[in-house]
């Protein structure tokens, strides 16, 4: 995951996302529980962060967590232990993914493709590591088509991009998923009523290799 890593912002974001954990669960929890309801025993997560998704995985799940921000790692380890997951932490990025070809049944990520340096390359890596029939499940904030949110996204893009280590408020992720070569892509448009206006427009996607 090639993003603009900065030790100060990395530490600050690790602290912030830990503080916002309950808030994010309130905003995304129902959706995540639905999408992650029937995951296999081993799950690969890109951008596992501070472990916000650990609560949605079954106890005993083997979680292969890709997370380059070392300041997130203590929170991630604590969350995995709290929810009784077998954590395998890979402190690397997603391009390339540190996994063998056709080795994963499921890859998940939430609010990550907005931040990666080259989402096309990351999606290519996801397809590479998925087995035939394997699924990529993601929730991402995306560019609004028009209106107030689109205007706010354009207005705040530069400071948001700087503070959140490369996050794009207006990335056309749905289009990128459709062009990534998956056999099937199912996208659901969602509006999340969050106080963070630039990221209210979302998609939830299931992509099958």
Predicted features and spans:
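A short glycine-rich, Lys/Arg-flanked "PGG" loop and its adjoining helix->strand segment in the class I
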Residues: 120-132
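C-terminal lobe and adjacent flexible extensions of AdoMet/dcAdoMet transferase-like proteins
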Residues: 202-209
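C-terminal alpha-helical "lid/dimerization" subdomain adjacent to the S-adenosyl-L-methionine
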Residues: 4, 17-25, 139-199
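Class I SAM-dependent methyltransferase SAM/SAH-binding core
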Residues: 44, 49-96
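Conserved alpha-helix/loop element of class I SAM-dependent methyltransferases that forms part
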Residues: 19-42, 52-56
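N-terminal, positively charged/glycine-rich alpha-helical extensions of SAM-dependent methyltransferases
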Residues: 1-15, 29
């Amino acid at each position: 995951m090639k993003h603009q890593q900065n030790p100060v912002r990395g530490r600050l974001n690790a602290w912030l996302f830990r503080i916002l954990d309950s808030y994010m669960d309130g905003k995304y929890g129902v959706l995540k529980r639905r999408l992650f309801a029937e995951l296999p025993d081993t799950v690969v997560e890109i951008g596992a962060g501070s472990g916000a998704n650990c609560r949605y995985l079954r106890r005993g799940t083997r979680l292969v967590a890709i997370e380059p921000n070392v300041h997130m790692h203590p929170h991630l380890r604590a969350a995995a232990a709290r929810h009784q997951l077998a954590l395998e932490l890979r402190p690397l990025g997603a391009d390339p993914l540190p996994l063998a070809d056709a080795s994963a049944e499921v890859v998940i990520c939430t609010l990550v493709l907005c931040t990666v340096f080259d989402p096309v390359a990351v999606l290519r890596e996801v397809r590479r590591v998925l087995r035939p029939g394997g699924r990529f499940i993601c929730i991402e904030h995306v560019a609004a088509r028009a209106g107030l949110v689109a205007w706010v996204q354009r207005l705040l893009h530069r400071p948001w991009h700087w503070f959140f280590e490369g996050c794009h408020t207006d990335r056309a992720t749905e289009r990128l998923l459709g062009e990534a070569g998956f056999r099937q892509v199912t996208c659901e448009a969602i509006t999340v009523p969050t106080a963070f206006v630039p990221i209210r427009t979302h998609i939830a996607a299931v992509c099958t290799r």
